[in-house]
Amino acid sequence: MLKNTEILNMPVIHKITHLSELSKIIKSKSGYSMTIGVFDGIHLGHQFLINETIKIAKNQNHNSCLISFSNSPYHFLTKKNDSNNYLSTKYEKTNILSNYKIDDIFFIEFNDEIANTKAYNFLEYLNT
């Protein structure tokens, strides 16, 4: 059974389908320290990035944020739909990431809009 403090420390999970949604949420916060990646199978490198993001956020009095994808950018871009190539299911990934003391987790749907967005413009959405 979860304790009230455990419930309060769980991250807010956002499902994003358009970059404008992401930008709107980011604008509503006082500041974010972010890490971005697919995070399929949370290995030691991922753990380091997540923990460093949390540490930097605390030091800068920001919210900590992890941005991942609800679907595989690789599979989207190559048109391969092989669900057996994942190390963890979406459910497992969400559960694993929820154990970190990160404030917000964004799962962005990798779609044509994201695929056609230049890297600079993508960063503009994050730095609004």
Predicted regions, residues:
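Nucleotidyltransferase catalytic core that binds NTPs
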Residues: 1-128
